[in-house]
């Protein structure tokens, strides 16, 4: 048994998280009250990864919901799937973190963290052999960013050999809630670089662009954005939840995707993109899906993969299709886009196929890319951080909670190091003995 315990922290984390549970409950044939209504044996075969079967026969998510204010919890609890979660697993404070990372990490969050760890411990005790944790949170606020990263460092101490995955929503200038987002995000990334094994970077800006450009939604709501995120999360976790051939657990995914321990920030993508409530009216072929997967417009992260190179890629196809066709299409796209893959990692594209399509679609595909272009996000946040930090703007909110300026300086330099590491591997060619090949490659490029 390889269970995963899911934690959702803060307002954003809880909204994305509860949407994720709606989607996967539906895929596994579990209704909002936790009763199995499905018809396929494969739906339950590996449902234990995310669901615990209670003595009453109900399926209960292995999820812990936390926030520093009661508001979000109330809306999850009163939502359609509110009664699905175990009532003891709602953990909330009263004061809120007020978008202040220091409050989430050092003061308010630190007071609540032991309670949360107890709840998580209980969840882990109900597992036979836990493979790891996944967390949904945003990096721009106080609770998800500050308290979320505090929890991650606590797990690292308590479960050092378990995989830690996060779905982290990056702040973006176009969709900004607060002026201190660059501070909160930089401090969070400083933690994530050291303490997580896999981080899926989800970017509100990219989600907005997809909603406006591709889905033609005139004014997208957070509900529309969360729909896109949940489709991607469902796709990324397909291999873990259904019998499939490859990347059947978090550790295998990490081994295939992370060539250097610090470079574990992935760009997710999804095809075909559909808006909420509209079923897909077009027939899709495997070649369509493959084309869309590698299209910059389908990335959930606001950076252009054509500005960098892929270190590794994993693609998960769902639906009735032949493995042979999938392999051929993936092979041809690799050849077509060979300059965008580093040549010093051979066979750096992994493909998995799962027979069960997502609800409402005939077939779909999910993309996970470890591309050096992700440095664009970090650069963007770093520039905004430096502009404010140079003037020491808003710093008193953080020092007032007991933080030191030194911590800001460290976080800033760690993020800049991360950017230069990505840049270094982007420019790296095969060893010098391959000079001849490189010349040939450049000549082709010039032609």
Curated annotation (Swiss-Prot):
Entry function = Tubulin is the major constituent of microtubules, a cylinder consisting of laterally associated linear protofilaments composed of alpha- and beta-tubulin heterodimers. Microtubules grow by the addition of GTP-tubulin dimers to the microtubule end, where a stabilizing cap forms. Below the cap, tubulin dimers are in GDP-bound state, owing to GTPase activity of alpha-tubulin.
Q: Name one GO biological process term.
A: microtubule-based process
Citing just one GO molecular function, the answer is: metal ion binding
PROSITE patterns reported for this sequence: TUBULIN, TUBULIN_B_AUTOREG
Q: Which GO terms describe its cellular component?
A: cytoplasm; microtubule
Q: Where does it live in the cell?
A: Cytoplasm, Cytoskeleton
The segments labelled Disordered in the record are 424-447
**Where do the annotations place GTP binding?**
11, 69, 138, 142-144, 204, 226
> What is the source species?
Enteroctopus dofleini
What are the UniProt keywords, alphabetically?
A: Cytoplasm, Cytoskeleton, GTP-binding, Magnesium, Metal-binding, Microtubule, Nucleotide-binding
Which residue intervals are annotated with compositional bias (Acidic residues) in the record?
433-447
Family (UniProt):
Belongs to the tubulin family.
What tissues is it present in?
Lens specific.
Amino acids binding Mg(2+): 69
Pfam families linked: Tubulin (PF00091), Tubulin_C (PF03953)
Q: Where does the protein principally reside?
A: cytoplasm
Oligomeric and partner information: Dimer of alpha and beta chains. A typical microtubule is a hollow water-filled tube with an outer diameter of 25 nm and an inner diameter of 15 nM. Alpha-beta heterodimers associate head-to-tail to form protofilaments running lengthwise along the microtubule wall with the beta-tubulin subunit facing the microtubule plus end conferring a structural polarity. Microtubules usually have 13 protofilaments but different protofilament numbers can be found in some organisms and specialized cells.
- Cofactor(s) required, per the database record: Mg(2+)
Name of protein:
Tubulin beta chain
